[in-house]
Amino acid sequence: MKTKIFCDIAELNLIKKFNKKKIVKGFTTNPSLMRKAGAKDYRSYSKKILSICNNKPVSLEVFADDYVNMKKQAMQINTWAKNVYVKVPIANSKGEFMGRIIKELNSQNIKLNITAIYSAKQTEKILKLINKKT
């Protein structure tokens, strides 16, 4: 197995610093980290991150909690850059499994980072839904 290091940060100065490190293979963030870093507009802040890391994968998380808005956000995020991965939680804040959206986005060849997985059972559910070649 080959280990890859991804930084889970949102501060632009730290992203610039760690983007120069060969050991760092990509970045992941979420709306909470971005707010703490001073982001006022999710899209414009995300695009700043993507422009800094244009040669490494960057996972940007949807912040909607329902299927319709989550899909809308995922489709938008997917258009922002070639190196973007759409980060989708395995369950929403009500504990509802987000399998439907994960399956749909995966079937459209949208690169996904499925987050907040806490058990082998959750992993098994995802593996039954996705095309493992994507």
What do these predicted regions represent?
Residues I110-T134:
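Catalytic alpha/beta core domains of metabolic enzymes, predominantly
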Residues K2-T3, I9-K16, K21-V24, T28-K111:
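Active-site beta->alpha loop and helix N-cap motifs at the rims of alpha/beta catalytic domains
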